[in-house]
């Protein structure tokens, strides 16, 4: 697969011109709006000066007008600043989507990206890790990729539960000597898992489910909130690799088959992935060779929302870091299914 060096060489030769042209188009929209806002603020100032001239003899009225216009001027300035700031973030986001798709195009000519699409809940539920009977599921940034006739997909996932909260509003009526209490009920979202779901196939077929759960029993918060919502089945398997046992708890109904699947080679590959990105990962190996990987606190959305300083120009370092993260996702398939 092409690497960062290849991409930066492509950037210097061709892509810089293509990206700059796209950024310039968005810049024009931003500066057009900026000019309108500046003109609007100048008009407020002119009206402000004219009113002072017209009502200058009446000091009380003048001071009142000055005060009101100062409030209006400050309010519109604040609103316009917020609008511009939001537009800058939106432009940064749009540019990042362009970069994301261009990097995918550079790495493969066969991919599908849909920003507001999630993996079908039925397919997600088939991996049998999180209990969707008691969890709410949301997703976005669905991406399907085909490299060297190997297909895989990934998307952002949010799994959460809700609990009812009560907010009290108290009012004391002195005339009747009565304390009125009003209860407002609302649902509070409690995130259980937020990260990336990655699904692929490996050549090494498995005869039963095998689950790798990150060893978090020293973390009371995770133990309390995550494990209650995991629905995996099987018995805990102790592998001969002590270091791997310290990182992951292995569950399966078939100890012999799980040991066959989790060979030293496969464990080394999983360790290699952990070195590339240290985020906690949950692995599900299915009977048909499908593998589901849940990467905690790693999302495409966070990558797309990262500020890219587009007004001064997108730097090579920024593009290189962006490429590394996308390349990592595409390399998961390459590493795990490496012969």
Q: PLM features: residue spans?
A:
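Charged, low-complexity intrinsically disordered regions
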Residues: 101, 105-108, 117-161, 186-339
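Transmembrane alpha-helical segments and their cytosolic interface motifs
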Residues: 31-47
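Membrane-interface amphipathic/juxtamembrane segments adjacent to transmembrane helices
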Residues: 6-12, 87-108, 112
């Amino acid at each position: 697969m092409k690497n960062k060096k290849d991409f930066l060489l492509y950037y210097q030769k061709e892509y810089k011109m293509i990206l700059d042209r796209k950024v310039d188009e968005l810049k024009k929209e931003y500066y057009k709006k900026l000019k309108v806002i500046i003109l609007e603020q100048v008009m407020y100032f002119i009206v402000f000066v004219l009113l002072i001239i017209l009502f200058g003899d009446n000091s009380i009225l003048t001071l009142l007008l000055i005060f009101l216009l100062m409030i209006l001027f400050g309010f519109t300035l604040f609103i316009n600043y917020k609008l511009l700031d939001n537009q800058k973030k939106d432009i940064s986001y749009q540019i990042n989507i362009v970069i994301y798709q261009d990097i995918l195009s550079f790495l493969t000519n066969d991919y599908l990206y849909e920003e507001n699409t999630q993996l079908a809940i039925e397919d997600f539920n088939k991996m049998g890790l999180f209990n969707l009977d008691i969890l709410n599921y949301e997703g976005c940034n669905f991406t399907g990729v085909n490299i060297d006739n190997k297909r895989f997909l990934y998307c952002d996932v949010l799994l959460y539960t809700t609990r009812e909260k009560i907010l009290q509003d108290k009012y004391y009526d002195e005339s009747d000597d009565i304390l009125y209490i009003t209860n407002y009920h609302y649902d509070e979202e409690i995130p259980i898992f937020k990260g990336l779901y990655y699904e692929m196939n490996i050549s090494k077929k498995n005869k039963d489910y095998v689950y790798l759960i990150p060893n978090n029993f020293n973390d009371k918060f995770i133990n309390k909130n995550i494990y209650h919502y995991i629905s995996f089945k099987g018995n805990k398997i102790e592998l001969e690799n002590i270091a791997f046992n310290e990182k992951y708890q292995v569950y399966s109904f078939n100890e012999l088959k799980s040991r066959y699947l989790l060979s030293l080679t496969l464990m080394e590959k999983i360790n290699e992935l952990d070195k590339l990105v240290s985020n906690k990962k949950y692995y599900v190996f299915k009977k048909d060779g499908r593998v589901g990987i849940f990467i905690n606190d790693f999302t495409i959305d966070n990558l797309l929302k990262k500020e890219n300083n587009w007004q001064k120009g997108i730097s090579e370092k920024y593009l290189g870091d962006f490429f590394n993260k996308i390349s990592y996702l595409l390399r998961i398939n390459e590493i795990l299914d490496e012969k």
